[in-house]
């Protein structure tokens, strides 16, 4: 759905990760599973499914970056796999903090500022200097 609604890479990446963080925030039990907490005594099948989920998400993010290279003529500052890995690691880290805080520190807290920081070094300078692509800026101008 996000891929069909957004044509530009930055909003697509942001909305995809924000969807993950928002879902985790609204579903603490799933957050534990995504973080690996609830998997200690679980079957290998569940552990495998979580790994597959993250692999598929990473593949989708890589596709967004590759599409940006083709359709928007922008490239990340490092190889796509490396660039996407840091985005996913940031989102996973936010979920981990949420679980460790006993669900007192929402994964979306301060995400917009962190997103701006991540994007500042993500794409080559021509895009990194255009923070207006952020959903936070779009939403704040609407209010």
How should these model regions be labeled?
Residues 22-62:
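Short secondary-structure transition hinges
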Residues 12-15, 19, 49, 56, ...:
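Alpha-helical elements of Rossmann-like donor-binding domains used by nucleotide-donor carbohydrate transfer enzymes
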Residues 7-10, 40-44, 55, 74, ...:
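Alpha-helix boundary/capping and short turn/kink residues
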Residues 24, 61, 65, 91-98, ...:
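Hydrophobic recognition helices of helix-based DNA-binding modules
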Residues 1, 41-45, 93:
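A short alpha-helix capping/helix-coil boundary motif
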Residues 2-3, 65, 69:
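Conserved hydrophobic residues forming the short capping helix/wall of the S-adenosyl-L-methionine
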Residues 31, 35, 47, 69-117, ...:
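Hydrophobic/aromatic-rich alpha-helical bundle segments in the mid-to-C-terminal region
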Residues 1-30, 80-87:
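Hydrophobic alpha-helical connector segments
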């Amino acid at each position: 759905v996000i891929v069909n609604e957004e044509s530009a890479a930055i909003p697509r990446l942001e909305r995809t990760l924000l969807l993950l963080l928002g879902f985790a925030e609204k579903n603490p039990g799933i957050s534990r599973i995504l973080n690996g907490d609830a998997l200690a005594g679980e079957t290998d099948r569940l552990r495998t499914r979580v790994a597959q989920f993250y692999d598929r998400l990473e593949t989708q993010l890589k596709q967004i970056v590759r599409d940006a290279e083709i359709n928007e003529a922008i490239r990340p500052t490092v190889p796509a796999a490396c660039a996407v890995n840091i985005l996913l690691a940031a989102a996973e880290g936010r979920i981990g903090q949420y679980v460790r805080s006993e669900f007192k520190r929402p994964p979306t807290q301060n995400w917009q500022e962190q997103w701006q920081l991540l994007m500042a070094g993500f794409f080559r300078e021509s895009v990194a200097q255009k923070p207006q692509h952020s959903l936070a800026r779009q939403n704040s101008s609407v209010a």
